[in-house]
Structures are given as structure tokens and as C-alpha cells.
Amino acid sequence: MSSSTVRDLQRDLENKANDLGKIQKDIGKNHQLRKKYTIQLGENELVLKELDLLEEDANVYKLIGPVLVKQDLAEANANVRKRIEYISAELKRLDAILQDMEEKQNNKRETIMKLQQRLQTIQAGKAKA
């Protein structure tokens, strides 16, 4: 094989390695975002448990900017449930994206390994010649 073929393979290997790095960075971002949503889900579930403990005529206040505003218990309950639904849906979406990215990562790794083996075979053949 010619040295230009080896150079092309090396360039291709470098490009694939860069792509793999980008995928891994995206996976890291996804994990961070997922962690944030998981924390928010836990906090909202705690709020919901606290709201469930209250009597029907209890006063509930919502912090809006620097001001506490009185809110109806049923409305507060509904808002927290909607938030939990939204966060749960986001977590499912992130899980699907993560699964897709991990598949892409595995495919890139396989491609990189095949390219490396091919390069090593070519270079070993040149060394014998």
C-alpha cells in the first residue's frame, strides 16, 4: 500500500476520534442535565408530600420574586403535579437521547478499532518488506 493510503487512513482515524470525543462530551452534558432534573424531581415530590399533609383550609404561599403570594391549596397541588409530569417526561426524553448517543459511541469505537487494526496490519506489512 502507498504512503498516501496510510495517510488517508490516519486522517480518517483522527476524524473518527474527534467525532467520538464530541459524542462523549454530549453524553457528559446529558448526564449533567439528567442529574439536575433528577434533583428537581425529588424536590417536587417532597413538596407534593408536604402539600398532601395539609388540611383543605391551610394557607399556602408561593414565592414570586421577593414576594410571598397566597395560593389556593388545590392550585398549588396541581402546579406541583404538572411540574412532576414535565420533569418525568424530560427524564424519559433524556434517557432516549442518552441511549442513542451511547449506541453511536459504541459504533464509533468499533470503527476506530477496525481502522487501527487495518493501519497496524499495513504498517506491519511494510516493516516486513
Curated annotation (Swiss-Prot):
<dbReference type="GO" id="GO:1901703">
    <property type="term" value="P:protein localization involved in auxin polar transport"/>
</dbReference>
<dbReference type="GO" id="GO:0051879">
    <property type="term" value="F:Hsp90 protein binding"/>
</dbReference>
<keyword id="KW-0143">Chaperone</keyword>
<comment type="similarity">
    <text>Belongs to the prefoldin subunit beta family.</text>
</comment>
<dbReference type="InterPro" id="IPR002777">
    <property type="entry name" value="PFD_beta-like"/>
</dbReference>
<dbReference type="InterPro" id="IPR009053">
    <property type="entry name" value="Prefoldin"/>
</dbReference>
<keyword id="KW-0963">Cytoplasm</keyword>
<dbReference type="GO" id="GO:0006397">
    <property type="term" value="P:mRNA processing"/>
</dbReference>
<feature type="coiled-coil region">
    <location>
        <begin position="6"/>
        <end position="26"/>
    </location>
</feature>
<comment type="subunit">
    <text>Heterohexamer of two PFD-alpha type and four PFD-beta type subunits forming prefoldin co-chaperone complex. Interacts with PFD2, PFD3, PFD4 and PFD5. Interacts with LSM8, a specific subunit of the LSM2-8 complex, which is a core component of the spliceosome. Binds to HSP90 to facilitate the formation of a larger complex made at least of HSP90, PFD6 and LSM8.</text>
</comment>
<dbReference type="GO" id="GO:0006457">
    <property type="term" value="P:protein folding"/>
</dbReference>
<keyword id="KW-0539">Nucleus</keyword>
<dbReference type="Pfam" id="PF01920">
    <property type="entry name" value="Prefoldin_2"/>
</dbReference>
<comment type="function">
    <text>Binds specifically to cytosolic chaperonin (c-CPN) and transfers target proteins to it. Binds to nascent polypeptide chain and promotes folding in an environment in which there are many competing pathways for nonnative proteins. Together with other chaperonins, contribute to the regulation of gene expression by modulating the spliceosome function on pre-mRNA splicing post-transcriptionally by acting as a co-chaperone of Hsp90 to control levels of LSM8.</text>
</comment>
<dbReference type="GO" id="GO:0016272">
    <property type="term" value="C:prefoldin complex"/>
</dbReference>
<dbReference type="GO" id="GO:0005634">
    <property type="term" value="C:nucleus"/>
</dbReference>
<feature type="coiled-coil region">
    <location>
        <begin position="84"/>
        <end position="118"/>
    </location>
</feature>
<dbReference type="GO" id="GO:0009409">
    <property type="term" value="P:response to cold"/>
</dbReference>
<dbReference type="GO" id="GO:0005737">
    <property type="term" value="C:cytoplasm"/>
</dbReference>
<dbReference type="GO" id="GO:0043622">
    <property type="term" value="P:cortical microtubule organization"/>
</dbReference>
<dbReference type="GO" id="GO:0071370">
    <property type="term" value="P:cellular response to gibberellin stimulus"/>
</dbReference>
<protein>
    <recommendedName>
        <fullName>Prefoldin subunit 6</fullName>
    </recommendedName>
</protein>
<keyword id="KW-0175">Coiled coil</keyword>
<dbReference type="GO" id="GO:0051082">
    <property type="term" value="F:unfolded protein binding"/>
</dbReference>
